[in-house]
A protein has these predicted regions:
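Extracytoplasmic soluble-region selector
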Residues: 25-208
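Extracellular beta-strand/beta-solenoid scaffold signature
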Residues: 82-83, 171, 245-249, 255, ...
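Acidic Gly/Asp/Thr-rich repetitive segments characteristic of extracellular carbohydrate-active
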Residues: 206-247, 573-576
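Right-handed parallel beta-helix/beta-spiral solenoid domain characteristic of secreted/periplasmic
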Residues: 213-215, 237, 241-243, 250-304, ...
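Parallel beta-helix/beta-solenoid
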Residues: 228, 250, 255, 267, ...
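Feature marks extracellular polysaccharide-active and adherence modules
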Residues: 236, 261-263, 289, 296, ...
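Predominantly extracellular beta-rich ligand-binding scaffolds that present long acidic/polar faces
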Residues: 401, 435-546
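Surface beta-loop-beta hairpin patches that serve as ligand-binding interfaces in beta-rich domains
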Residues: 536-581
Length: 581
């Protein structure tokens, strides 16, 4: 019995040991693996020719294996190592790819721009310099061609041989300082030693040290507004756009004028362009209310009313052009006196109603002593010159060497609805006012209505050595409201309508229709009216033309009478031009 009990205890121990051994040999259960679902590549562009550290964001964050393999699309642009360091090889764009290594086959890409890689240095071999002479005294931009085209550094340095004659900028803009010759030199900056030079001649630089030079609208307006006696404003050529009236209201002094002058020798004229204006009687271009101004060499274009209105006195307007304005190109009024308009042109002035706008007008309430010398007026809708009075009386206006032609016609040559006279001497609402007028060496030609028009002017009118050709009526001083006096000497009239020469007192002698003379086209070198439009001389004076110049043998030669004008030969010739041998 006791033996069985011992045997049973041994079997229990053995079973317990067997169970313990089995428990010790069981493994832990293996957890489930988490795969990569997406990748996102991060990294900066290479701009210095160096390298950039690439990185990757793995989703999900608890992916079991987050290691990636790196690759690039073009190893000639950049290479990448196993840690994601991207190294530049040459300039360009490369695609970087990250690939998961957990068997998920997930990839991601990013395009990287590579720049700043320096290749082999290519030196400059030659420089070609493009320059030209300066004839107008203005700045000029020069240029160069640097070869080879793939030179590493194509920058150049600009130099001039004499900085007292000209200055030149880093970009090759040359600024003339005075007339003369100067060498322009260009040197390569890459250390190659390549250089070239060219000599240029500078002309057209004016001495403007006595004034200021302006080249833009704002500076111009400021200079005009702040002008003082003796100031000189030199205006560079070009277009100056304005939308409102410019007031010249400062006063100069006798012998100490305020001057606005086109910059000497510029290749283009300064144009006051009022195209932005609407047509309105208040929209004058320039309002000159100041005294003692000198304005030379400007154009006034497309004002909404007068191009220039002068209400000041003792002003000189020289070599200016007034065109395509909506009223008179230049008008004198409001008591303005003793103004001189010298060598100016006024043409193509017309309003939108096609019935108004003169070339020049000294009219309405103008003052005494105004003069027009060497001026031309053509194809103005109304009159070439208008002297109609309202609000003043007994004034005298003088005209010397002035040409009025084709007035009453528009720019396109068609006839408009204006009065169409060359010189309208005067007239008034009550037909009583006196506008005295003196015309010497003046021409009226091709005007639609009258060449020299009385228009009920009650003043004294004088014509010395004038010519009237091809007008509706050449000289028309009728019997109604006749002039106080009419003096005509050394003047011809031909190829026009019937003339009349009525006045209370007349002194009419030695003219082309008197003393047995007849005037016709055979007396002249040319009767082509279009020649009157010929360009002026560079100093602004009238052109030398053949129109109405006497031919040798004309019976108008030496048939005049001395009226105090210069002449050659035994006596003055008849007409505006002395015969030239």
């Amino acid at each position: 019995m006791k033996g069985k009990i011992i045997e049973m205890r041994l079997m229990s121990v053995m079973m317990l040991l067997a169970l313990m051994w089995a428990g010790c040999n069981d493994e832990e259960p293996t957890p489930t693996e988490v795969l990569v679902s997406s990748l996102s590549v991060r990294g900066e562009f290479i701009e210095d020719g160096g390298s950039s550290q690439m990185s990757v964001i793995v989703t999900p964050e608890d992916a079991t294996n987050q290691k990636v393999d790196w690759s690039v699309s073009n190893q000639e642009v950049a290479t990448i190592d196993e840690t994601g360091v991207l190294t530049a090889v040459t300039n360009g764009i490369v695609t970087v790819t990250a690939t998961a290594t957990d068997g998920s086959a997930v990839t991601a890409t990013k395009s990287i721009r590579v720049s700043g890689v320096q290749g082999p240095i290519v030196l400059v071999e030659s420089i070609s310099l493009s320059v030209e002479d300066i004839t107008d005294g203005r700045e000029k931009q020069f240029s160069v061609e640097v070869l080879p085209t793939n030179a590493t550094n194509k920058d150049v340095e600009w130099l001039v041989s004499d900085e007292s004659i000209a200055e030149i900028s880093e970009e090759g803009l040359l600024k003339p300082l005075k007339n003369g010759s100067v060498k322009v030199k260009v040197e390569a900056k890459d250390g190659s030693g390549v250089q070239t030079e060219e000599e240029i001649v500078i002309t057209g630089v004016a001495d403007v040290s006595d004034g200021i030079v302006v080249d833009n609208s704002n500076d111009l307006l400021s200079a005009i507004a702040n002008a003082s006696p003796g100031d000189k404003i030199y205006l560079r050529g070009g277009n100056y756009a304005f939308g409102s009236t410019i007031s010249f209201n400062k006063d100069g002094q006798e012998g100490n004028l305020i001057s606005l002058i086109a910059y000497p020798n510029d290749s283009e004229r300064p144009v006051f362009d009022f195209s932005a204006m609407s047509e309105n009687s208040s929209n004058r271009g320039i309002q000159l209310s100041g005294d003692y101004w000198y304005v030379k060499g400007i154009d006034v274009f497309n004002a909404g009313d007068n191009g220039m209105f002068i209400s000041g006195s003792n002003n000189l307007i020289e070599f200016c052009y007034f065109y395509e304005n909506s009223d008179s190109g230049l008008q004198i009024g409001n008591g303005a006196a003793n103004n001189t308009v010298l060598n100016c042109d006024s043409y193509y002035n017309a309003d939108s109603s096609i019935e108004n706008a003169d070339g020049f007008a000294c009219k309405l309430d103008a003052g005494d002593g105004n003069k027009f010398i060497g001026c031309r007026a053509w194809q103005n809708l109304d009159d070439g010159w208008d002297g109609y009075l309202r609000g003043t009386d007994n004034i005298t206006t003088t005209y010397e060497n002035c040409w009025a032609f084709l007035n009453g016609k528009l720019k396109d040559g068609s006839v408009g609805g204006g009065d169409g006279n060359g010189f309208k001497t005067g007239g008034s609402d009550d037909k009583l006012l006196k506008h005295h007028a003196v015309y010497t060496n003046c021409i009226a030609a091709g005007n639609v209505v009258d060449g020299f028009d009385h228009n009920s002017n009650r003043g004294d009118v004088v014509l010395y050595n004038c010519g009237a050709h091809g007008n509706g009526r050449n000289i028309n001083f009728g019997t109604g409201n006749i002039a106080n006096s009419l003096t005509i000497k050394n003047t011809f009239s031909f190829e026009g309508g019937g003339d009349s020469y009525e006045a209370t007192t007349t002194d009419i002698s030695n003219n082309g229709w008197q003393i047995g003379l007849t005037t016709n086209a055979s007396d002249f070198v040319s009767v082509d009216i279009e020649l009157l439009k010929s360009p002026r001389k560079t100093d602004g004076s009238l052109p030398d033309i053949d129109y109405l110049k006497l031919v040798s043998g004309s019976d108008l030669i030496d048939q005049g009478v001395n009226v105090g004008l210069d002449f050659s030969g035994a006596a003055p010739d008849i007409g505006p031009f002395e015969f030239e041998n």
